[in-house]
């Protein structure tokens, strides 16, 4: 009863509700989160010497995660009988995620809720990442820029036929472009984002750090 009341109040107040330990596979759609790598490095990665931030990579938007989502709220840390991924399976995701540690954490928090094995979830993340064309112009960002956050969304819309404005939201963190979040059906097709997912950044001069 208390769980139901908390969820009801969250909906009434317009807040997103999440629940830990839900049953795996019980969700409505995915949110795929793509992070601008160099900004993440400035905010977090550089301080810990993360390999993702080494200039040899030339990362633009990397895959942050593929998150099971309810029409209102989201599950996390679900109960599952599936085994955790091996170190090798996680390391194999570094080419699109920047590192094995993030891949494993995404499995632990979100992947267990997908109702898939770890191997199948990693494969789904790779397929999801492959459904989106990262606008080629981003690879040419050779110096820090200040841009309207809406430019990021527009670039994705132009590069991805079928992607509509209500299917993507761009977020900022501490004045920097943070992520492009794209909503996908359970079979990884573009779909409209529910209201609690939308976090549109309205900055007119958000920092887009140089590729590295």
Model-inferred region functions:
Residues 1-3:
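Positively charged n-region of N-terminal signal peptides that target proteins for export
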Residues 6-14:
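Bacterial N-terminal signal peptides
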Residues 17-21:
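Boundary at the C-terminal end of the N-terminal hydrophobic targeting segment
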Residues 22-51:
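N-terminal regions that are enriched for targeting/export leaders
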Residues 33, 45-212:
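Domain-level detector of nuclease and nuclease-like folds
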